[in-house]
Every structure is written in C-alpha cells, then in structure tokens.
UniProtKB/Swiss-Prot annotation:
Disulfide bonds: none annotated. This is Fluoride-specific ion channel FluC. GO terms for cellular component: plasma membrane. PANTHER family: FLUORIDE EXPORT PROTEIN 1-RELATED. Fluoride-specific ion channel. Important for reducing fluoride concentration in the cell, thus reducing its toxicity. It is found in: Cell inner membrane. It comes from Burkholderia thailandensis (strain ATCC 700388 / DSM 13276 / CCUG 48851 / CIP 106301 / E264). It catalyses: fluoride(in) = fluoride(out). It comes from the Bacteria. Its main location: membrane. It holds the Pfam family CRCB. It is a multi-pass membrane protein.
Amino acid sequence: MFYSIVAIFVGAGLGALLRWFLSIGLNALLPEVPLGTLVSNLIGGYLIGIAVVAFATRAGLPPEWRLFVITGFMGGLTTFSTYSVEVMTHATQGEFGWALAVAALHLIGSFTLTGLGMWTARAWLAPA
C-alpha cells in the first residue's frame, strides 16, 4: 500500500507541475482559448491512450507503474475542473460561441488523441 501511495503522489505532483508550466507558457498566446489547459488535456488524452494499451499488453509490470502513470501523472496533468471554469466563464459573459468552441476543442481533441495514442501503442508494441 505504501508504494502505491508514493507512486500516485509522485506521479500527480509531476503531472500537475507539467500542467502549470504549460499554462504559464501558453495561456497568454490566445486568452479566448487558454492553450495551457487545452494542451494539457490533449497531451493527457494521447498519453493515456498509449498507457492503457501498454499496461494491457505488459501484464508483468508492477501495479505501481500503472498507478504512477494513469492515476497519478495523468490525473495531475489533465483537468476537467479548469476546463469547466473556462467554458462557463465564456458562457456567463455571453460568449456562447467561444464557450462552445472551447468545449468542442477539448472533447473532440481529447477523444481523437486518446484513440491516436492507443493506435500508436498498438503499432509500437505489435510483434515484429
């Protein structure tokens, strides 16, 4: 149990730091669509697609690795609450087009990149 807690704790901290760095570096580029949150969610979608397939095909890995990557790192990197606030901020300001655009970018982009990540992992991990 101790190693599971440490794996989640460290993974979440690293994921959250990456999200923060992305926000610092990208949010000012396009204030209407905070790119730090979007890029965090898109990267997270892609990486979790890879991780799910990789862990499914690598049964011998210790369970702490899955907890570190999926529960910890991806949980710290991706954010539904910040995305929700950004969409609702546009909506409450009457910017319904921007609200819809931000929502669509996150949802469609994340689903697309998760699928791409799964495809990538299957291609990498396929028997030669």
